[in-house]
Amino acid sequence: MTKGTDKNSNQMLVAHLSMFGACVGWGLMAPIGKEAMLHGVSGLSMVTFRVVGACLLFWLASLFARKEHVSRRDKLMFAGAAVFGLLLNQCCYTLGLSFTSPINASIVTTSMPIFAMLLSALILKEPITGKKALGVLMGCSGALMLILTSAAHVSDKVGDIRGDLLCLFAQFSFALYLSLFNPLIRRYNVFTINRYMFTWATIMLLPFTFGETMATVSSHLSMKTWMEVAYVVGIGTFLCYILTMVGQRALRPTVVSVYNYVQPIVSVFASLLMGVGVLKPTHALAVILVFTGVWLVNKSRARGDAK
């Protein structure tokens, strides 16, 4: 094995571990963030805490990172990336969750890798191979099996088509971000990328949510709730976006998106560890389907292989 091949293998391993780590953080963020929203933090306030808090953390981290020159054109491109990768994705999902049931919202999130596969074919000319399509289908089946069997004994409110459509658009928005801005993401380090994206998102979001967020801040939340918000901002946003960018720089958009199916696994196992869930045989089958799906998508042909 040559040094170049060995280095590339190490980069791919780091990329996959980073995506898995991000999905673990996001999977744990779901129950923790939901708990905070049940105790005084509104959905839009939570989005604002995430965006503004992560913006401040990325500016602070940038003081210790390598300085990079960013062209004026790319600065404007980061504004577009912030719209599709942050604002539309987070705001639509949060608003959708307020209309529909958590189960419906979880089911809708399984559409994102399908959108990513189709958009990558249209925009990046990535081939849709049988192996890739089978991998996405297997991952989707595993995630749906996990969500539906876990929800079988949960009393949940009826879904709402408005909320379902908003959650669906959130997935489409993030898939579009993965395909449109993939070349931009590969040009800069993770701190430069996130600093500009979260700065643009803060500028665009804060004028509309400042009043509601300040009302939340002054509402005497408990220390436990503030700790939950801190997790959502520090781990679920700051750290997870760093890990996602590391993965996105080395992996194809469809591979990045199919890791979305790992999040329900993390949520279920977190509930088992917390003693609020019961392990079922279908959980093991779902895990096998998801990780087999990720493996198949990763092994499918890339654009360069198709030439």
What are these model-predicted stretches?
Residues F58, A79, L119, I128-S150, ...:
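Hydrophobic transmembrane alpha-helices of multi-pass small-molecule transport proteins
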Residues A36, M46, R50, G96, ...:
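Hydrophobic/aromatic residues within transmembrane alpha-helices
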Residues G25-A30, W59-T109, M145, V233-L251:
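Specific transmembrane alpha-helical segments of multi-pass solute transporters/efflux pumps
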Residues M46-F49, Q90, N104-S111, L180-T202, ...:
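Helix-helix packing/entry segments at the starts of transmembrane helices
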Residues Q11-H16, G40-L44, T48, V70-L76, ...:
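Juxtamembrane helix-entry segments on the extracytoplasmic side of multipass membrane proteins
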Residues T2-F49, D156-P183, I203, P207, ...:
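Glycine-/small-residue-enriched transmembrane alpha-helix faces in small-molecule transporters
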Residues C23-G27, A81-Q90, P113, I147, ...:
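Transmembrane alpha-helical core positions of polytopic small-molecule transporters
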Residues G33, L38-L88, F115, S173-L180, ...:
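Transmembrane alpha-helices of multi-pass small-molecule transport proteins
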